[in-house]
């Protein structure tokens, strides 16, 4: 018996090291839940435990940064550049969300232990969505993330808006998951496998079954919901507005990044060149056209709707839809890449874009959380009137985040957009060139609502009494980290994108470990 157990432990297909970051995050979540059972409502302790667990997970992830790419667990787990870069985004997002949440958990009557545990379990699911090289693993990771997020969205049990947000997210999220799962089932029926690497080989065959196209289309619907692309975006504004602000920040960044990681792995690596130009040029052009139109609509609808908003959270919700469209430009560029190196660079660009979006958006939501007060009472534009003179630190910091979201040069948002647009522009395709032009025009349109908030803060008089809130230490740390990130990634982005590209190229995957 001991010999069999030892053989399993040293079996290259059962590599515990490759899933160590995920295991650490899951175990930390369990520890937080157990601690909260015996010593409830210890916000600082459960928060500290969560941050330590995330830091240890990041340490083990970084220790494997220069390892060659490989798969493990019978090909179900992939260790490559896509996994590494996106996993760092998830861990960073969760850590900053915990720091932002301190001011919220202090003033709201929420079960803080459950909140930290759910956030860790959501991160655990996100990590598997990036590392999963099998449709089953990706779906399990997605559901772990989704269920945890449903719970967090409804943590304010006595708030009708929070309850409505959680219910809408649960119903529509379940509907999208059903589409995704049915699509995966059809792909399995067409290819007799759920392994993404094996699916890629099947797609390259010109005689692949038509059922594969139906399955792929249904999976696009499922991923489109999770990413919040048009026309699958309708849930986003109501859910983002009703959910507690720190949870909204996590959903806007963490959930979206995780969905993009899986989207890239399935449709760029599993369906090479987006359903395989080797199989059918007509089919290839059809996929490109459909996704390009989706990207243009997502950017345009998101920006136009954001202009019409009078609530900052709803404005940021529609802004996140537009940013999903920008990231989709890089996704399509990766699918159109003419070589493995170009494809890896495009994937790294999308990961970098999600990192810059995370840094900027989390910083903005940190200030919104601080100003909103209990039950998010102050989230309208008029609540920001004149705060530039009463709290210049908050106003100037929020202005920096708005300018980065717009894409002002020397900010992280600018470099993120430049790098994510480049692969599509280099593809030499007329439709993709039009898509990039549309993205640039939409970026210019977005200046209206981002600058509107800045104008409100500095050029509108306040008609009500307002005292500048005290900035807690943890939230000050979150703001400092995000401000440094916005400036650093805007000026010194070359090193980061090069590291993402070289971490371990996805095309280098060869053998099991």
Language-model features, listed with the residues they occupy:
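Alpha-helical transmembrane segments of multi-pass membrane proteins predominantly involved
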Residues: 1-513
